[in-house]
């Protein structure tokens, strides 16, 4: 899918996901039907998602960690996809540097770090080592509720 200037402007306007397609169309000088069609296409292509986000530190009993993973083999994409489907994983990214993958993981009172390592990560073969970074305070962090 080609991302043009109109698509970028649509994405910017949808920062407020409750905004009407009509008001966006009026601002961008395009038709409401064009907005609707383009947003549908952006969603189908996994370029855009419209969802409620929250600050994990604002909800009692919730926190987030960042986990660096070193793999024993260089099957980065395959392992990234596999790990991204584990419970609590907000995102898994293939990175440069001392880790092969970096994860953002969400926890609550019923599902914590111990459960993540014993019930989820332990299922994944080919992990050489992990390092966990507990997020004490974050700025501008908003994530989807996935638990």
Residue ranges and their predicted role:
Residues 1-147:
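A compositional/biophysical signature of low hydrophobicity enriched in polar/charged and small residues
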